[in-house]
Amino acid sequence: MALLVEKTSSGREYKVKDMSQADFGRLELELAEVEMPGLMACRTEFGPSQPFKGARITGSLHMTIQTAVLIETLTALGAEVRWCSCNIFSTQDHAAAAIARDSAAVFAWKGETLQEYWWCTERALDWGPGGGPDLIVDDGGDATLLIHEGVKAEEIFEKTGQVPDPTSTDNPEFQIVLSIIKEGLQVDPKKYHKMKERLVGVSEETTTGVKRLYQMQQNGTLLFPAINVNDSVTKSKFDNLYGCRHSLPDGLMRATDVMIAGKVAVICGYGDVGKGCAAAMKTAGARVIVTEIDPICALQALMEGLQVLTLEDVVSEADIFVTTTGNKDIIMVDHMRKMKNNAIVCNIGHFDNEIDMLGLETYPGVKRITIKPQTDRWVFPETKAGIIVLAEGRLMNLGCATGHPSFVMSCSFTNQVIAQLELWNEKASGKYEKKVYVLPKHLDEKVALLHLGKLGARLTKLSKDQSDYVSIPIEGPYKPPHYRY
């Protein structure tokens, strides 16, 4: 696709695959709104006061129908928005078209190359001569990463005149990042510094992105305040758990049509995502084996009736392998060589480095056969046996299906709206330093409360005597911050 920014009749910038899908996107968006009570409640509560009036928000988060409802919630509260996806395969093109036509600048399409992906990220951050965004909604931390790497390169350039060298790294994706920054230095050597100075803060959606933020906080390089949305209970214990329980089998069946019952499924990692995946596979009739480094998580898996072994113990016996760790080098090419014919290998953690895709792609004599988009069979020359890799090792639930359903994403995205409001409303108060924060318990409980009515729930209320007895306010919060749920 030619990397040229287009404009709507109203002058809004965009780059999507097919604007003719906008009507279809709008229909699905309207269906999703009914399933997203938290976001709709935010529009009702905050819309009249327009709290985001004057705010520029950049989003780097899967451009799905559910995200479209989030974007239109931000614009309904007064924000101006520019958006890109955080994954080359996760965009739903009809959702991107609907938003680009009706609501916000979007730069996203399904099946981007890495070069296109980072071009889209750069466009979403580009607000013209006035600098960058005021706020970032991030998923995985790529938008945050680009600004931090850009600032670092500009400081080196100012001191030494040295520009980034893309050949200094073996990572093909980071080579692209360095090339983008290098080109930017020639146009404006203070581009990313201007972004940093304007930025009020970022709210981060995922475990992987949160890890990056805490690493930067620890080494003193975090450039602006950050709110860790992932560790809100109404995100991690719902989106990560129940969302993956829903979307893993959906992606597997759409990609392969394989029968899960009777198969041996290996879930690498037993955190919230791994727990949801293991539950889905067990319910579908698979025999589930978990790999873990953490003895507490391992014991939890055992108490659920699952086996806990190493990958090496089961690599030649299992039928389905799912990585959920957020770490790298979980399934290596040497593991894949030992797998049975047509074993399915997929990732639902975050980045594609959980599975050794580079090692697979460069394995001598390996043959790649594309069955359909995001479903590839890789045949090893010495055995003539093949494995099926989904979504090129990236998020299979978004690459091979449509991700998590609207209701559970409403919980996550309501947290995002609240986090963005918190950062924006406190921008002049000094409340938030260059650190990582978590939303307070009363806001977590508010997000849950907004979703109960949709499911027909009625809460019991504490009496005054009961409240005094347990030292819990009648209106909450009901649990201390350290409570684990």
Swiss-Prot record:
Assigned EC number: 3.13.2.1
Involved pathway(s): Amino-acid biosynthesis; L-homocysteine biosynthesis; L-homocysteine from S-adenosyl-L-homocysteine: step 1/1
GO biological process, any: post-transcriptional gene silencing
Organism: Arabidopsis thaliana
Keywords for the protein's UniProt record, in alphabetical order: Hydrolase, NAD, One-carbon metabolism
Signal peptide boundaries: none
Phenotype on disruption: Embryo defective arrested at the globular stage. Null mutations are homozygous lethal.
Name by which UniProt lists this protein: Adenosylhomocysteinase 1
One GO CC term on file: plasmodesma
Family under the similarity heading: Belongs to the adenosylhomocysteinase family.
InterPro entries reported in the protein's UniProt record: Adenosylhomocyst_ase-like_sf, Adenosylhomocysteinase-like, Ado_hCys_hydrolase_NAD-bd, NAD(P)-bd_dom_sf, S-Ado-L-homoCys_hydrolase_CS
Subunit: Homotetramer.
Broad enzyme group: hydrolase
Entries under NCBIfam families matching the protein: ahcY, PRK05476.2-3
Cofactor or coenzyme needed: NAD(+)
GO molecular function: adenosylhomocysteinase activity; copper ion binding; mRNA binding
Lineage of the species this protein comes from: Eukaryota, Viridiplantae, Streptophyta, Embryophyta, Tracheophyta
